[in-house]
Amino acid sequence: NTRRQRQMCIRDRSEIAVRQGQTQLILTDKGLSFERLPMPMLLCVGAINTYLIEKKLRGYVSINVQSGEALDTHSFATLIGVGATTVNPYLAFDSLHQRHEKKLFGQYSFDDCVARYIKSVNAGLLKIMSKMGISVLSSYRGGCNFETVGLSRTIVNDYFPGVVSKISGIGLTGIEKKIRQIHKEAFESTDTVLPIGGIYRYRKNGETHQYQGRLIHLLQSSVSSNSYSVYKKYAEGIYDLHPINLR
């Protein structure tokens, strides 16, 4: 089956469940295997939320998400923003448990670690919502108060109607290709240590950062020493970078 057919199957099953009187839907990406590939949770939630709204059934059911994709406040905000009622970040909890078993959290119990994680996520969500003048999660849920970058307008119209999409991008076929590639690398690799990735901090083989450590060091050195020649090295390094930002 194509990814679009699977998305339609999920929508149809959700409608049937609601019409049969179910009040809780649970979407989970657990149970992956070599033969079982995940679907992006954001697309699943958006598809079901939009479809149930069209059928005038959304108010009768809660959409509960159990996903390994939910790790930081951005992922929580987007999942809730497209319609998720609750989010269970099981992979984040598993990661906390692993680190707690290694005694990396000092005197804190595992329950304390989970509580502190939840508190930080809630604080991050409140900060995101407050920038829009929203203080209640129910007012933020399903509002799609963001815009997409790199998704085709067909996907945006089908799964996230009303979301601003100034720049188009890949469609379902492209997304599926990426998922298959990542899934293949994960299940065929013999490595037991995950690559760091460099999302939050610059890594040599990780994600590209405009403000790399070397350049930041040059900027700080130029300020502390009041050296224009060092600043020129910093400026040259910035100009030599390949285009990174869209603007």
Each language-model region and where it sits:
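Single conserved hydrophobic/aromatic residue that forms the stacking wall/gate
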Residues: N1-I10
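Gly-rich Lys/Arg/Thr-decorated short loops/hinges at beta-loop-alpha junctions or inter-strand turns
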Residues: R3-R4, L27-L32, R58
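Structured alpha-helical segments in the cores of large, soluble enzyme domains
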Residues: R11-L25, L42-K55, L125-I128
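Active-site-adjacent structural elements in folded domains
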Residues: R11-R13, L32-R36, I48, N64
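Short beta-strand segments at enzyme active-site cores
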Residues: T23-D29, P89
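Glycine-rich, proline-tolerant flexible connector loops at the mouths of alpha/beta enzymes
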Residues: L27-L43
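Phosphate/diphosphate-binding loops
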Residues: T50-Q181
